[in-house]
Amino acid sequence: MTGLYSSMSFFLRTIVLLFSTSSFCNTFASLTQDSCHPDQRDALLEFKNEFKIWYPNGFLDIDGVLMDVTSYPKTKSWTKNSDCCYWDGITCDTKSGKVTGLDLSCSCLHGRLEPNSSLFRLQHLQSVNLAYNNFTNSPIPAEFSKFMRLERLNLSRSSFSGHISIKLLQLTNLVSLDLSSSFPYSPSSLSIEKPLFLHLLALNFMNLRELDMSSVDISSAIPIEFSYMWSLRSLTLKGCNLLGRFPNSVLLIPNLESISLDHNLNLEGSLPNFLRNNSLLKLSIYNTSFSGTIPNSISNLKHLTSLKLQQSAFSGRIPSSLRSLSHLSNLVLSENNFVGEIPSSVSNLKQLTLFDVSDNNLNGNFPSSLLNLNQLRYIDICSNHFTGFLPPTISQLSNLEFFSACDNSFTGSIPSSLFNISSLTTLGLSYNQLNDTTNIKNISLLHNLQRLLLDNNNFKASQVDLDVFLSLKRLVSLALSGIPLSTTNITSDSEFSSHLEYLELSGCNIIEFPEFIRNQRNLSSIDLSNNNIKGQVPNWLWRLPELSTVDLSNNSLIGFNGSLKALSGSKIVMLDLSSNAFQGPLFMPPRGIQYFLGSYNNFTGYIPPSICGLANPLILDLSNNNLHGLIPRCLEAQMSSLSVLNLRNNSLDGSLPNIFMNAKVLSSLDVSHNTLEGKLPASLAGCSALEILNVESNNINDTFPFWLNSLPKLQVLVLRSNNFRGTLHNVDGVWFGFPLLRITDVSHNDFVGTLPSDYFMNWTAISKSETELQYIGDPEDYGYYTSLVLMNKGVSMEMQRILTKYTVIDFAGNKIQGKIPESVGILKELHVLNLSSNAFTGHIPSSLANLTNLESLDISQNKIGGEIPPELGTLSSLEWINVSHNQLVGSIPQGTQFHRQNCSSYEGNPGIYGSSLKDVCGDIHAPRPPQAVLPHSSSSSSEEDELISWIAACLGFAPGMVFGLTMGYIMTSHKHEWFMDTFGRRKGRSTRTR
């Protein structure tokens, strides 16, 4: 028995020993095989030496937001005497020791990636990540196509440029491809061969799960073949300049979890009827031309966590079927055309943290359905039509950090419970009708508040002490414009927030410069406009180191305290001093200023040559001062950057200098109301961005500038009250009209000749309907608009902003002859037509009846005959008509707009009559009875008529003499008031101002 036990024991020990030996050998062999092959190591070391180490300042995403990316040089760990399989960013195959993975993302690499790079000797690579480096705009080498085992390729945000080689599409094993960058449409962006690349991509990459080509210039439509990429789980095509209509079927790919089509403004499409069991988690269609409604089938997206459809053209109501999206955390529908009320079913979205429906046409009261969503951190309902009161129970949203209800019609007071939400960092209630300041004193409870916007409401009942905001130590932005403020308790020693960057106190009844501002070292923008501040601008203002935007307009300031040396060396880029009482010579603004507005002051002297030292001015407005002398020729140096030059209403003389050769961005030039002479400079023909040209009320002596019709954006042309001469029709060449002109005022010059019947055929902008409310020269920054003075309805009218819908043709006060062109009838969007004080003949064209938007028609002081076309009686928009002093005959049209006019609108036309004229003008235009036709000859009739006239004159002499003596007595004995009360009619009088 003992022998058997010993034999068994020996047998077991032998087996254990053999197993242990085998395990050790396998482990040793494995360790040996993990070692990096020398050729792999050498290739990597050569690759390391191809680049310099570069430490980036950061990376921006496509929206310009700084990304949370940390970079460090991974290749620093690569040394010749170590195993490359253990280097940072390297993965090796456990059996062969070949390099299969290379992750050098965020590795501070700087230099060109050349086609002969040693990288391409690593033939066994399955994953390559070179994201967040700087390959200095080198093309993506086609040699990547040699990596036939490659499954993942990430070259994002690494400064590649040029055409993407179609050879990359040979990598048919790819499951993830990221070629994105942060700068769409830039010269250095990547691009593809259109349209072949996308077709082959869809056909070759059937296994692809993730595709990101953001900021790659695709500039074509997405082919229907993308719908067959059933393995896709993530598709990101931001900022690719996608065109055409996006295939709905792509949104229905069964396994698709995330799709983003943001920043493709020309991409059209609509949301499909979503199927059940859809896998979508994130749907982002932002800044596109997608339209249509949100379908009720949105409820089938049971797993959706983020829905972003902002800045597109979606419309209709927000569907109540959103209630089914129980996992939704982000809902962004801003900047669309949604209407109606927010559905109560929104209250079911218990996971919602972000809710943004700003810039739509929503209405109703504050959406109470939001008050039950206690996870909400962000609410933006700005720029809608909400009314009523803000809810008193808003404090239920205890996690709220951002709340903005700006630009609505909320009334009443700010709910006191709002000040219990201690997590609030942003509170925006500007541009409403809030009128009760009672609860504003509780604002001090919001210790975390960084942005407070209460401006432009109706807070006028009582003053608010500015010191209630002293406790808000984290404030960065404070806007209180329109709130009457008391600053008596605020001194330079008051401990206001030291973080303040933006301060808006316009229209706050402030009478002196707030002293606390002098300690705001981080302040970059200040608005003290529309107050009653008198005296001088304190010198300490210019010493604020970060100050860049200053608006002091519409006060009573007369000058500056102390030297302006600090101003000239400041960072200020926008300075608005308009509508004050500044006097003396014009000072030199900071060289880096971009917006300098000094209009409506008393600046005198010459425009100093030093103004030509400005680096890149965009807007220069010195209008309505007392400047004289010449316009400096050295301004030519500024024309490459100037967008607006306004020198209106000064005493400038000489000629308008020929300085516009490089004025490629000049959109508005106004030198009206000076004493300029000579001709218009020919260099204006190169101002391809010019929208407004106003040279009114000068002494310019020139012919009509036909060459201006080559300007592609010219919309306003005012040559009024100069010495222009010649014809308005280019008889010596082809006349193309002015396709974009909306306002043309060439009145009170010396234009002659006739206008052909097709004269207005190419005035396209006044022929087509304009539906969108826009302003000509609508600014992107600082709210600067060009104003204009025009004649309308017989009076001078100033427009502070020029609407694109407002259209004018004013040829009055010239010597134009012939017929009014029949083509005037195609100008269906024309609002004002003034052809008065010329020598037009012929008839009033019946085509005027097509001008259904016409408000003012003046053809007085001409030689026009015939009848007023009865069709004009249908022009319901016509408010003011003047056909006086012509040779018109017949009845006036039947229409209330003709019956409302003063008698002066018809005088000087003894041949016109009408039933309504008797009420307006008395018996002089009473309806004429039908005259019987006598059988004798016309000659005898004429002689008889002459005889009857003499008899009537004699018979009327005696009673007429009596009547005249009686009237003389009445008027000279101060009884004319009795006479007018008894027999006369008081009439309104149009006042002409200029």
Swiss-Prot record:
Residue intervals annotated with topology Cytoplasmic: 968-994
Per-repeat ranges for LRR: 122-146, 148-171, 174-199, 205-228, 230-253, 254-278, 280-301, 302-325, 326-349, 350-373, 375-397, 398-421, 423-445, 446-471, 477-497, 498-520, 521-544, 546-569, 571-595, 597-613, 614-637, 639-663, 665-687, 689-710, 711-737, 739-762, 803-827, 828-851, 852-875, 877-900
UniProt keyword Nucleotide-binding present: no
Disulfide bonds: none
Residues with attached carbohydrate: 116, 134, 154, 277, 287, 420, 435, 442, 489, 522, 554, 561, 602, 649, 701, 762, 834, 850, 882, 902
Topological category with respect to the lipid bilayer: Single-pass type I membrane protein
Protein name listed in UniProt: Receptor-like protein 6
Organism: Arabidopsis thaliana (Mouse-ear cress)
